[in-house]
Amino acid sequence: MRLRNGTVATALVFITTFLSLSWYTAWQNGKEKLMAYQREFHALKERLRIAEHRTLQRSSELHAILDHFRRMIKEANGSRDAFSHFSDETQKLIKDLTNRKALQVPNIYYHMPHLLNHDGSLQPAVQVGLGRTGVSVVMGIPTVKRKVKSYLKETLHSLIDKLSPEEKLDCVIIVFIGETDLEYVQSVVANLEKEFATEIGSGLVEVISPPATYYPDLNNLKETFGDSKERVRWRTKQNLDYCFLMMYAQRKGIYYIQLEDDIVAKQNYFSTIKNFALQLSSEDWMILEFSQLGFIGKMFQAPDITLIVEFILMFYKEKPIDWLLDHILWVKVCNPEKDAKHCDRQKSNLRIRFRPSLFQHVGLHSSLAGKIQKLTDKDFLKPLLHKIHVNPPAEVSTSLKVYQGHTLEKTYLGEDFFWAITPVAGDYILFKFDKPVNIERYLFRSGNPDHPGDQLWNTTVDVLPYRKDIVELRSDTKENRLPDGFFRIGKFEDGLAEGTVNSNLNPISAFRLSVLHNSAVWIILNEIHIKRNPAD
């Protein structure tokens, strides 16, 4: 009997292990396939961008030829003798071409005309590394000469030492030396080659620097926003450094993340970044933020870099990089006829913040001479007491009294948890979508590790369909219709409410959590996930 029981137990362990391995393998294969599809998609978009760029180049060359013909005709003063040796057909063609007044399309040379004076102004003057491509994440680290202390080696060690062997094959770290003094650049390269010989030799690390001809004259810039002449020059050059680095990095991977040369990274930062991006693969985001400070930890999709660089180059003399990034979002989604709150909601769908922060600023001495910079990211060491999801744009409201700034708006955006004082019957939490949305699933989780008892009880989940004349409903669904037009589709059990939305109720105008009875405890809502239908 013991032998038989032991055999059964062994068989169960074997089957459980086999099923677990099968599930994990399928899950891992699914992730890898998604990354492969993303690579193919981004490669296709990149080829399209290159084709468009070449078309613009050919168009510019044609305009140059036509301008040459126009000058020839003007110099000939319309004399027939000047073109008498051409056939009638050729003369007619020249006349037709020179009479065309096509509009010129602005490009990088319009904003930086000095680049036309030298060949190779957009090619690195120094380039060290294997030129690795086809990775998931490209990390860009700009560095310049600091008078007091350089943090570059410590930054690179922090990033590299926290990568697994597999992760080291799926990324590339680009160090951009923003100096034109070749002697200094070569000294930095020599130090990096000595310290990181293995990483450079494997293709993990690359080092580049721009040619002196890439930079315009930075000595006669207009002073704006109360900044000194030196600070205006510093921030203007910084914008140009970012642009060169991003243009170089764009074709190397699926995502590009901007870092600085004076940071430290959290353990498992790479897998966290990659998995978070994969979760949002179906969302229309533009910036993922993995730090709240400046330009640190801002990640972009490779195809979006073209727009970002073009926008920065249009205004590189006017404002710092973080302001310009916010302006891009404003231009894309903000309606001048709406208020600032509506604008912030729209921008939050393009600019998604991950918490806690994955990178911490450690540099005390800024690259701007004489500036002491005591900036630290307060979210870096915080435990995560809420979960982050991207929800449909909505106006949120509640009858509950909020505690210590833990607002519903922040929770909906994935920035914090919602904390409110004791609910009573009739209290509600309302999510009114900016436009009707087809919803597949929902999840609301209350309580958190610090306050596990602060849960929602006796609370229902209601939805308001956009269509008022719904007839394609089962009788049990119709019975859940409330007098105000909402439909009751779920309730909280053990602090959790989750489920699907009947497809016949879609599209949905609003979600509501309704408190049915007085509660004896405060409530925390730490996770909100209203998942769109993927086909929406």
UniProtKB/Swiss-Prot annotation:
Sorted keywords for this record are: Coiled coil, Glycoprotein, Glycosyltransferase, Golgi apparatus, Membrane, Metal-binding, Secreted, Signal-anchor, Transferase, Transmembrane, Transmembrane helix
What family does this belong to?
Answer: Belongs to the glycosyltransferase 54 family.
Pathway, per UniProt?
Protein modification; protein glycosylation
The UniProt entry's GO biological process terms, in alphabetical order, are:
glyoxylate metabolic process; N-glycan processing; protein N-linked glycosylation
Q: Where does the protein end up?
A: Golgi apparatus membrane
Lumenal compartment spans = 28-536
**GO CC list:** endoplasmic reticulum; endoplasmic reticulum-Golgi intermediate compartment; extracellular region; Golgi membrane; Golgi stack; peroxisome
**Protein's name according to its UniProt entry:** Alpha-1,3-mannosyl-glycoprotein 4-beta-N-acetylglucosaminyltransferase A
Topology within the bilayer: Single-pass type II membrane protein
Q: Which residue windows are transmembrane per the record?
A: 7-27
Q: Record keywords: DNA-binding included?
A: no
Cofactor(s) needed, names only, are:
a divalent metal cation
Could you tell me what this protein does?
Glycosyltransferase that catalyze the transfer of GlcNAc from UDP-GlcNAc to the GlcNAcbeta1-2Manalpha1-3 arm of the core structure of N-linked glycans through a beta1-4 linkage and participates in the production of tri- and tetra-antennary N-linked sugar chains. Involved in glucose transport by mediating SLC2A2/GLUT2 glycosylation, thereby controlling cell-surface expression of SLC2A2 in pancreatic beta cells.
Organism, as annotated: Xenopus laevis (African clawed frog)
Superkingdom as given in the UniProt entry: Eukaryota
Activity control note: Inhibited by UDP.
Q: Which reaction does it catalyse?
A: N(4)-{beta-D-GlcNAc-(1->2)-alpha-D-Man-(1->3)-[beta-D-GlcNAc-(1->2)-alpha-D-Man-(1->6)]-beta-D-Man-(1->4)-beta-D-GlcNAc-(1->4)-beta-D-GlcNAc}-L-asparaginyl-[protein] + UDP-N-acetyl-alpha-D-glucosamine = N(4)-{beta-D-GlcNAc-(1->2)-[beta-D-GlcNAc-(1->4)]-alpha-D-Man-(1->3)-[beta-D-GlcNAc-(1->2)-alpha-D-Man-(1->6)]-beta-D-Man-(1->4)-beta-D-GlcNAc-(1->4)-beta-D-GlcNAc}-L-asparaginyl-[protein] + UDP + H(+); an N(4)-{beta-D-GlcNAc-(1->2)-alpha-D-Man-(1->3)-[alpha-D-Man-(1->6)]-beta-D-Man-(1->4)-beta-D-GlcNAc-(1->4)-beta-D-GlcNAc}-L-asparaginyl-[protein] + UDP-N-acetyl-alpha-D-glucosamine = an N(4)-{beta-D-GlcNAc-(1->2)-[beta-D-GlcNAc-(1->4)]-alpha-D-Man-(1->3)-[alpha-D-Man-(1->6)]-beta-D-Man-(1->4)-beta-D-GlcNAc-(1->4)-beta-D-GlcNAc}-L-asparaginyl-[protein] + UDP + H(+); an N(4)-{beta-D-GlcNAc-(1->2)-alpha-D-Man-(1->3)-[beta-D-GlcNAc-(1->2)-[beta-D-GlcNAc-(1->6)]-alpha-D-Man-(1->6)]-beta-D-Man-(1->4)-beta-D-GlcNAc-(1->4)-beta-D-GlcNAc}-L-asparaginyl-[protein] + UDP-N-acetyl-alpha-D-glucosamine = an N(4)-{beta-D-GlcNAc-(1->2)-[beta-D-GlcNAc-(1->4)]-alpha-D-Man-(1->3)-[beta-D-GlcNAc-(1->2)-[beta-D-GlcNAc-(1->6)]-alpha-D-Man-(1->6)]-beta-D-Man-(1->4)-beta-D-GlcNAc-(1->4)-beta-D-GlcNAc}-L-asparaginyl-[protein] + UDP + H(+); an N(4)-{beta-D-GlcNAc-(1->2)-alpha-D-Man-(1->3)-[beta-D-GlcNAc-(1->2)-alpha-D-Man-(1->6)]-beta-D-Man-(1->4)-beta-D-GlcNAc-(1->4)-[alpha-L-Fuc-(1->6)]-beta-D-GlcNAc}-L-asparaginyl-[protein] + UDP-N-acetyl-alpha-D-glucosamine = N(4)-{beta-D-GlcNAc-(1->2)-[beta-D-GlcNAc-(1->4)]-alpha-D-Man-(1->3)-[beta-D-GlcNAc-(1->2)-alpha-D-Man-(1->6)]-beta-D-Man-(1->4)-beta-D-GlcNAc-(1->4)-[alpha-L-Fuc-(1->6)]-beta-D-GlcNAc}-asparaginyl-[protein] + UDP + H(+)
* Pfam families, alphabetized: MGAT4_cons, MGAT4A_C
From which residue to which does any coiled coil extend?
28-54
**Main subcellular location of this protein, as a coarse class:** Golgi
For the Cytoplasmic compartment, the record's topological domain ranges are 1-6
Q: Which GO terms describe its molecular function?
A: acetylglucosaminyltransferase activity; alanine-glyoxylate transaminase activity; alpha-1,3-mannosylglycoprotein 4-beta-N-acetylglucosaminyltransferase activity; metal ion binding; protein homodimerization activity
